[in-house]
């Protein structure tokens, strides 16, 4: 009987699967964490690009003589965010606020603020992604 237990103690068959079972949850958790960080970085870069495109849209419209409203700029930014290439989900929001005293004389200054919550990809955990915010000024000529 002691020889059987000695054989079982020295037997290493199946050790690989046991080690994998111990390490797999940690490795899979790290993988989902990398995906979550990547989604956050993509969302932040998308927000910066959307802000740049929205600013350009507002400036070009003012140059054409079309005085677009703050609501029109917000709608344009939200439409750009939900379409290709960004394809952000419905948690995206754009707000435009006119600045009462512009920093550059002879201009209208507006502040564009974008907020977005990236989707959570971590399964089996009640994880909520942090809300991302990006702001930038828009200067248009006062003619």
What are these regions (language model features)?
Residues 2-78:
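Alpha-helical assembly-interface signal, strongest on the long, hydrophobic N-terminal helix that forms
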Residues 53-143:
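Short, conserved structural patches
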